[in-house]
């Protein structure tokens, strides 16, 4: 169902051998900008897209905001009637939080040497060391792409930061389990 093989060092490794890195991005309130600023942002985004020689995926995640911790704090500090007013308002209003992500792909190229390596008998430790070296080289290529995207989108006023392993796991977990707001995520190592 989900093509994720593993997540290592903030890198999503797919079952087909591809890699994905995820940047979390700040937002820009485009509607509050002047016409000149909007034009500059639009041109900056167009220039950013034109510099890419690989595809990216822009993901916007909208979730209903859980205000229960805030309401609990209000109950401690404010009179009961004000807390009830806020509670009824939050029940009626659909207060949302939005998160913005850019997913950056990298697909390693299979070299001729590695494609015939299955013909040779090598020890498990040699194969493991070679696989780790290959992973680090491929991850370095993905990190270059992540840096290119973060710097490119930065020209529009958007800050982008790569997610670490735990943040990627949480993002995937929350994406595939949208109804579970308060349950902690179990990381089985």
Mark where each language-model region is:
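N-terminal basic/disordered segments at the start of proteins
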Residues: 1-16
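An amphipathic, basic-hydrophobic helix/alpha-beta surface used to engage anionic
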Residues: 21-23, 33-49
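Active-site-flanking beta-strand signature of metal-NTP-handling nucleotidyl enzymes
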Residues: 19-28, 100-106
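Short hinge/gating elements
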Residues: 25-31, 132-135
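Ordered, soluble secondary-structure elements with a strong preference for glycine-centered loop motifs
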Residues: 31-39, 53, 136-143
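N-terminal pre-first-transmembrane
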Residues: 46-64
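Structural flexibility/helix-modulation signal
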Residues: 64-92
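An aromatic-glycine-centered, glycine-rich loop/turn in mixed alpha/beta architecture
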Residues: 1-3, 88-189
């Amino acid at each position: 169902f989900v093509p994720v093989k593993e997540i290592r060092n903030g890198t999503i490794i797919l079952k087909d051998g591809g890699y994905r890195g995820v940047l979390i991005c700040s937002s820009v309130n485009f509607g509050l900008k002047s016409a000149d600023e909007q034009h500059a942002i639009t041109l900056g985004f167009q220039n950013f897209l034109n510099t890419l020689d690989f595809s990216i995926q822009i993901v916007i995640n909208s979730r209903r905001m859980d205000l229960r911790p805030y309401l609990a704090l209000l109950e401690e500090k404010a009179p009961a009637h004000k807390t009830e007013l806020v509670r009824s308002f939050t029940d009626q209003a659909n207060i949302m939080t939005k998160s913005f992500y850019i997913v950056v792909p990298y697909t390693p190229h299979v070299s001729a040497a590695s494609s015939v390596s299955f013909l040779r008998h090598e020890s498990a430790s040699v194969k493991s060391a070679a696989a780790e070296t290959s992973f680090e080289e491929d991850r370095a290529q993905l990190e270059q792409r992540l840096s290119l995207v973060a710097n490119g989108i930065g020209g529009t006023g958007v800050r982008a930061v790569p997610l670490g392993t735990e943040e990627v796991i949480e993002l995937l977990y929350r994406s595939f389990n949208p109804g579970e707001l308060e349950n902690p995520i179990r990381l089985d190592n």
